[in-house]
Amino acid sequence: MIDGKEYVRTVKEYFAFLEVEYNMRLSDEVVNGSFYYDVSYKDKVRAISISYENAEDYLQVIIFILHNNKLANYDDKTKTLHLNRLNSLVLSTANKSEIDLNNEYFLGFETENGLKKRILKSAKELRLCLQHFNELSIT
């Protein structure tokens, strides 16, 4: 188990590229006891949620396409994009050089437990997905 403060700190560290490379702003931090944690980033067209349910050991990264600066209906699969689906689309288009460069970006990050490794893996996947985001056909 990870406590809320440690989760938020880890996500902010691993996903710092969202602010630096994509000019997204940290929009929300939620720590609901020891059960649910969420860190969200936002720009004018999308919001990204990195959430974790401690009891279920469930990590989830979702990109929401905004409409009039509001989140779309969660069930709208064209506007609520789960990282695992995007990752499978991107891996078929990204070349080895892009993947290697992306992995190099994250070399300095330390991970000492399973959850932090999964958070880091999600950060790597999201960064690569965002590099190809406008090329993806999401329907």
What does each of the following model-derived ranges do?
Residues 1-14, 26-139:
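Intrinsically disordered, low-complexity regulatory regions enriched in serine/threonine/proline
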